[in-house]
Every structure is written in structure tokens, then in C-alpha cells.
């Protein structure tokens, strides 16, 4: 209640629209300097004043630093700053409604800019709670996210109604809007938007979460196919004419950025606990709407646009690029839920021209080259991009470089890069040391027969780093659960240790099919590999590279791993071969037979994907696989529609 009466305690200067807009300009300039790797100047500008914009800027700066490294101490610090920003923006929102000299928009109710600041602070604060590792804090975080989303959606609704009136008006020019537009929008106040929250308390959430018998529908299903028309599209020309004021642009782009991120992120969640919380708070993601809103946010020369671009490029080059089955037809570039590579390339070029010194865009350029199977080019960029004034960006770059050295079979560089990851990040030391160790395993196998002295050195290093990994498992948790790779690696190394003891050999000599290729497979490096890299993978999978091939071949799990990895490499190596169908004569297949062949393969693909989607048992990498499966199903459904099947 103190928020409501605080203004009555101490008189404060009246708000002046011009001064407030200048604060917005200053903070946007500071945040863009942050993106351009000028950390010191950005920090200096953000501490210069005490406006809501400055408070939020400081909070977002801390939040981005914490998110990039997922460091708990930084998350806690960011949460404190964001709470201050939340309180300040709420107070300013109330004040802006009363001051006649405050900014008045033709589109939004008075004080909406501060309501947006409040919602952004609420949203980012909630994410820090979700990442805290505590289920209780995560539940509170999701509830807060829901409240923030309802507020943002309310602002969107106001805006869309205004745009509909403008779009359908054939007599009123945009340059001289009639008072009726403004008065119709002013009928709804920011208080009414802010209180559009669900009638659900955090206590209700805790109670429902703790009840194991509480039923809820299965909402971890593939997203719906794209609709023919989309009510959330805005004509770019209309938007350019309507949104000319800096504060209006801040609201317009900011709402789209936040709503788009929420809808996109929650459409990808397949974790059962997360899904249960989302269902209880009444939240459902929407991948298509989320991506469309983010693309709309990229149109403007401001910080919101840059973050929307980062989100889109990260989503497409990271998550979507991680998937195997994606649209490849001529219209694929216009499909927001596939991989629109031409749009992504154009967006990257635009952002690099705006922020030429930013390490983030170089990182995305390297990811894009990896997607195009130019791993050497990606590695060159990452090596040149290895130093940033923001240590979190350096850490992400190091991680990306470590993955690239893994995919390109640079074993020495791979070991070094993963050890560097362990020094720069505390997120998953088990994974970092394990991959460093298996990099030395391949060096050992390369020299085991040809150079025994060198092999012995590599063997010792392999054993050292592999055995370092299991004791560090469980240091980081999400929703009180261990990371999937931690669980898998502990099990894997434990099996090798038991074998080594039973067979009377060193740990490295008890290892079966290449764990190096296995990690390439898990991180979808097979898809990013060219013919040379795929041939190297197949070489590493040769049975004679193992010290004890006969004993390993008696293990069903090892045999299955070998066949899976080999099959995956062969499949990608031969993906461009023409379809053979049922013809063995070598004659060209008729159009009718080719269509039948494609239909048969498409239906078979869908059947297998649906079987995977409804797999009855849980497994360690279920969450990683779920997004790939749902994206593949979306692609298959789309292709069936295009083919008329």
C-alpha cells in the first residue's frame, strides 16, 4: 500500500515531458554503448540520473551480465536493482497520471511508458527467480511473469485498437489526428491495464504444485501450424507513420520485445514441472506470434530493437539450428517458425552496421557460418573475438569456440577451450572437464600404436580430466534438478571405472565407441559438419581404435551407440543423394512414382516423430529432444499441406 500513498508524504517536482524524453534518450544511448562493448561509459551514463529509465537501465545491465553467465551471485545482485526499478517506475506511473506537464501520447493512456518500465523490471526480476534453482522461487517468478504479460498484453490491446481505427479511417490524415482518437484511447487508464492480472495468488500456486494428484492437461505438444492470416502483423508503412515520437516508439517496440520473448520462450518449454506451473498460472506460449512480435520490434533504431535481434538470431542460429528437420522449400524464408536464413542474414548485417564494435554480432556471425558448415571460418572469427570488456560475453565466445573445435576435430584446441570454459564459468564444470578429457582420449588413440611416449602423456591427461568431472556434478541445478549432462556423464564415467577394474586395464582403455563423436552428436555438430568432418567422425568410430574392441562389442549399449553415431554421420553425408525409391534399374523415376515415394517417406517420418513425441518413459535428454521433435512435427505438417497430402 505504501506505493499508493508515498507521493503524499514528500512533494516532488512536476514531470516535464521534454526532460523525461531526454532521460529516455540518455539511457538508450547508454544501453547501446553497452552493446557496443563500451562498458565503462555505459555504466557512467546509467548512474548519472535517478529517473525510472536510469533505474531500469541499471537493472537490465545487471540482468544481462547475470544471464550471460548464469551466475547466482550476479542474479541476486540484479534482482535487488530490478526491485528498486520496479518501485521507482510504479511511483512515476502514478505521478505521470496526475501531472499535466508529463508526456501525453495520442496512442497510449498517460503514464504507459512507466507502466512498461514497471513490467520490464517485473519480467526480468521474475526470470532471475526462475533461474535461482529453487522451486518455490520459480513458482513466484512464474506468477510474476504472468502478471507482467497480462499488463503488456493490455498495452498491446490499446495499441491495436488505435491502429485499427487509423487503418480503417479513409478521411482522417495521420498528420492531423482528430481528438476523438485520443479521447477514445484515454477511456482506459494505466491503472486498469496494470490490474488485469489473474485472480490467483502465489499461495494457490504453492498448494497446487505440492498436490501430486492435481490433474492438468498435457500442454507439452507441438505448436499449431502457422495460420494463413495473422492478426498481429502490422503494416510497416502504417507503423512508420504512426510511431514517430521517441516515447511512443519505446513503448511500441518494448511491448513487442517483451511479449515476443515470453511467448517464444514458453512455447519451447517441455519440462513437466515448468509445464505444470505454466498451466496453473494460465500461461501458454505461441511460437509463431512470438517470432512475429520480435521481428516487428527489430524495425527501430533503439535498444529494444537490438535485444529483439539478439533474441531472434540466438533462437534461429541456436535452437532452430539445433533441429534436424526444417522447411527447405522456396517459401521457407517467409516461415517464421522455420529458419528464415535470408532474413537472419539481413538482420545480422543491419545490426553489425549499427554496432560495429560489438562482440555479440561477431558471435552470431560465427554461429551463422557454423550453420552453413563453414566451421573453419567460424573458428577464425571466434578466435579473433575472444576478448571483450564484458567477461560474460568472453565466456559465451569461449563456449562457442569450444563447441566449434569439437566439431572441427581440433583435439588439442578442444581440450584447451573446454578447460578455459571451466575457468570462466561455474555453470557446468562436469561437462567442461569431461569434454577436455575425451579430447585427450582421441589424441591418445591417434598415437597409441605410432608414438607410445606421446600416447602415455595423452592418457594421463585424459584420465585426469575425466575423473575430475563426476565429483563436480550437481553444483548447478534448475528447478532443484541436476543438469542432464551431469547425470549422463556421472553414469558414463562410472561404467568405465567398473570396466577398467574388471578388465584390469587403465580407465582410458576401457572406453568404447568414440565419446568425442558422441558429444558432437549431442550438440548437433553432425548437422554442422561438412564431408571432411563427417569422414573424420567415421574414422573415429572404427573399432580398431578401441583398446579392447572385442570386449566392448559384447556390450549391447556400446553396439547401439556405435550404430546410432555411424548411422547419423552416414545419413548426413548422403542427405543430398537422389531418391532411389523401389527402382534398382537406374532409370529415372517417373513423376507419379516420385510423388508416391515422397508421400510414403513423409508419412513414415511423421509416424516415427509422433511415436517419439508420446514416448512412455522419461529419459535424461528428454528436454533437449522435445524441442527438436516438436519443430520437426511442425515442419512435417506444413510440408503435408504444401504437398496436398
UniProtKB/Swiss-Prot annotation:
Family assignment from sequence similarity: Belongs to the IML2 family.
One term under GO cellular component: nucleus
Subunit description: Interacts with lipid droplet proteins.
Originating gene: iml2
Location in the cell: Cytoplasm; Nucleus
Source species, domain of life: Eukaryota
Protein name: Inclusion body clearance protein iml2
The protein's role, per its UniProt record: Inclusion body (IB) resident protein that interacts strongly with lipid droplet (LD) proteins. Involved in LD-mediated IB clearing after protein folding stress, probably by enabling access to the IBs of an LD-stored soluble sterol derivative that acts as a chaperone in inclusion clearing.
Keywords recorded for this protein, A-Z: Cytoplasm, Nucleus, Phosphoprotein
Record lineage: Eukaryota, Fungi, Dikarya, Ascomycota, Pezizomycotina
Amino acid at each position: 500500500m505504501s506505493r499508493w500513498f508515498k507521493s503524499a508524504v514528500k512533494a516532488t517536482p512536476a514531470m516535464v515531458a521534454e526532460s523525461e524524453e531526454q532521460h529516455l534518450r540518455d539511457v538508450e544511448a547508454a544501453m547501446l554503448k553497452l552493446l557496443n562493448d563500451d562498458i565503462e561509459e555505459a555504466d557512467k551514463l546509467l548512474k548519472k540520473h535517478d529517473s525510472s529509465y536510469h533505474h531500469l537501465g541499471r537493472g537490465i545491465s545487471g540482468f544481462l551480465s547475470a544471464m550471460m553467465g548464469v551466475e547466482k551471485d550476479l542474479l541476486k545482485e540484479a534482482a535487488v536493482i530490478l526491485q528498486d526499478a520496479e518501485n521507482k517506475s510504479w511511483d512515476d506511473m502514478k505521478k505521470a497520471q496526475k501531472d499535466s506537464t508529463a508526456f501525453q501520447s495520442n496512442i497510449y493512456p498517460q503514464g504507459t511508458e512507466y507502466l512498461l518500465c514497471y513490467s520490464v523490471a517485473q519480467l526480468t526480476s521474475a526470470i532471475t527467480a526462475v533461474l535461482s534453482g529453487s522451486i518455490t522461487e520459480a513458482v513466484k517468478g512464474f506468477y510474476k511473469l504472468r502478471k507482467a504479460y497480462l499488463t503488456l498484453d493490455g498495452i498491446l490491446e490499446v495499441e491495436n485498437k488505435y491502429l485499427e481505427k487509423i487503418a480503417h479511417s479513409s478521411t482522417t490524415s495521420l498528420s492531423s489526428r482528430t481528438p476523438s482518437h485520443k479521447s477514445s484511447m484515454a477511456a482506459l487508464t494505466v491503472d486498469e491495464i496494470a490490474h488485469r492480472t489473474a485472480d490467483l495468488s502465489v499461495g494457490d500456486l504453492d498448494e497446487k504444485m505440492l498436490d501430486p494428484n492435481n490433474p492438468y492437461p498435457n500442454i507439452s505438444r507441438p505448436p499449431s501450424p502457422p495460420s494463413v492470416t495473422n492478426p498481429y502483423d502490422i503494416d510497416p508503412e502504417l507503423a512508420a507513420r504512426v510511431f514517430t515520437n521517441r516515447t511512443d516508439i519505446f513503448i511500441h517496440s518494448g511491448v513487442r520485445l517483451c511479449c515476443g520473448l515470453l511467448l517464444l520462450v514458453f512455447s519451447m518449454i517441455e519440462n513437466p514441472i515448468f509445464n505444470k506451473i505454466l498451466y496453473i498460472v494460465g500461461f501458454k506460449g505461441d511460437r509463431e506470434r512470438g517470432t512475429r512480435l520480435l521481428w516487428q520490434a527489430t524495425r527501430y533504431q533503439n535498444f529494444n530493437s537490438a535485444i529483439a535481434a539478439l533474441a531472434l538470431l540466438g533462437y534461429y542460429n541456436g535452437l532452430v539450428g539445433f533441429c534436424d528437420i526444417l522447411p527447405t522449400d522456396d517459401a521457407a524464408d517467409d516461415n517464421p517458425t522455420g529458419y528464415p536464413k535470408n532474413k537472419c542474414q539481413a538482420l545480422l548485417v543491419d545490426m553489425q552496421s549499427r554496432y560495429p564494435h560489438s562482440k555479440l554480432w561477431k558471435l552470431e556471425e560465427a554461429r551463422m557460418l557454423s550453420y552453413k558448415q563453414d566451421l573453419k571460418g567460424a573458428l577464425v572469427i571466434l578466435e579473433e573475438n575472444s576478448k571483450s570488456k564484458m567477461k560474460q560475453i568472453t565466456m559465451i565466445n569461449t563456449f562457442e569456440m569450444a563447441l566449434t573445435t569439437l566439431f572441427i576435430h581440433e583435439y588439442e584446441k578442444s581440450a584447451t577451450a573446454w578447460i578455459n570454459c571451466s575457468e570462466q564459468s561455474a555453470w557446468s564444470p562436469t561437462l567442461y572437464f569431461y569434454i577436455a578429457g575425451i579430447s585427450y582420449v582421441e589424441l591418445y588413440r591417434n598415437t597409441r600404436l605410432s608414438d607410445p611416449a606421446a600416447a602415455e602423456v595423452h592418457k594421463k591427461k585424459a584420465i585426469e580430466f575425466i575423473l575430475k568431472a563426476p565429483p563436480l556434478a550437481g553444483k548447478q541445478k534448475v528447478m532443484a534438478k541436476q543438469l542432464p549432462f551431469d547425470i549422463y556423464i556421472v553414469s558414463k564415467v562410472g561404467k568405465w571405472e567398473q570396466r577398467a577394474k574388471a578388465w584390469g586395464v587403465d580407465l582410458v582403455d576401457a572406453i568404447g565407441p568414440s565419446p568425442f563423436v558422441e558429444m558432437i552428436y549431442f550438440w548437433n555438430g553432425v548437422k554442422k559438419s561438412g564431408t571432411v568432418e563427417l569422414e573424420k567422425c567415421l574414422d573415429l568410430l572404427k573399432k580398431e581404435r578401441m583398446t579392447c574392441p572385442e570386449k566392448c562389442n559384447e556390450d549391447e549399449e556400446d553396439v547401439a551407440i556405435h550404430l546410432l553415431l555411424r548411422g547419423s554421420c552416414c545419413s548426413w553425408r548422403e542427405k543430398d543423394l537422389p531418391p532411389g525409391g523401389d527402382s534398382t534399374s537406374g532409370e529415372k523415376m517417373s513423376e507419379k512414382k516420385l510423388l508416391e515415394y515422397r508421400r510414403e517417406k513423409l508419412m513414415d517420418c511423421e509416424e516415427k516423430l509422433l511415436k517419439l513425441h508420446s514416448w512412455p518413459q522419461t529419459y535424461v535428454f528428454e528436454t533437449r529432444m522435445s524441442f527438436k521433435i516438436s519443430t520437426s512435427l511442425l515442419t512435417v505438417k506444413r510440408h503435408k499441406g504444401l504437398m496436398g497430402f
